[in-house]
Amino acid sequence: KAIRRQRQMCIRDSYGADLYHRINWLGNIDGFIDRNVEKQQNGYLGEQVIAPEKILQKVDEEHIIIVAMEKKAAEQVMRLLRTAGYIKALDCFYIEDFLDFYTYQQYAFFAADKLMISSVCMIPSTVCNLKCKDCLNFSPYFKKHIIHDFTFVKRDIDTLFRWIDYTPRFQVSGGEPLLNKDLGRTLVYLDENYRNRIESIETVINGSIVPGDELCRLMKEHRIKVYLDDYRENVPQLRETYTQTVEKLEKYGIEWIDNYVPEWFSLDVEHTEHSDMTDLQLENYFDNCGSPWNCLENERLYSCNFAHFAAKAGIIEETENDYFDLKDYSEVRKTELLEFLLKYTTKGYVDFCKKCAGWSEANCNKVKVAEQIE
């Protein structure tokens, strides 16, 4: 449904503090709703606190209400709001429905005049020290790896943030990021220049190299989140370095995520053939795939990062349909970028769909994790 421009938000509180910190970048939170009289008198997190009775007397057309409570209480509050005349998904939202990315993204643009992107993936270097048979970045296919210097990377970052106001995730990936000499410099640049517009600055490492002390110091100081892949089951030579990496991250107090998965899915580009699909079938295939990742490279945003990786590896030819060119900034074109981020490409799909088995749930080709090419 359409979202009315400039509607302020009120948060029905319980988990409200967490939600407040997540969405305060929008700049249009107008307060909390709570029965607590002390909060009503003193405010909360610097915002006004409104009594529920005031909201329930009549529909407040100046605000939308986000219900941020545990399930049973949230359902009760939503019933009261609907009885009072509020319309679910227009005037009031469960927290999980509001944060559903398409709703959140469109609200940010049309109500708060802010452009956000679900995530950003950047690969300054494709160099990797593993040869995974089903690598989603197609590293084994590269005849010559691509390495961008810091000047190139910095330009891409600065260009992106001319266009967008916020992203929940910015991940500097690879290849193996620890083989990139400018990894620390890139992470520090993101934190020092754009931290107020990025919720989580991340990197992902494969456990084959123990990060150095200086990099660990920087990652701790600049609040970098590390995703640590766990390939020990199928690459046993990583067991020692994996353990040492965990110890190092713990020693420096770095936030890290155990990125273990029991199986991979294969994009299976060598055996997938969808060229007989009609345009409509390919559009539906692209929509059902639903890959949420956006890749940034050479001042371009790619709607499917796997299509971009495949083009870099020489598997397919890249076309203008695959990306949005960020070089020539225009306020008017921000609406075009929003549409592109919502996966509206010129064709309605990317040509790589014809050779790809799809992302995650759409893909039934399960394979061993990090199985190495001999």
Enumerate the language-model features and the residues they cover.
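C-terminal accessory region of radical SAM enzymes
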Residues: G253-L267, F306-N363
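Single conserved hydrophobic/aromatic residue that forms the stacking wall/gate
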Residues: K1-R7, I11
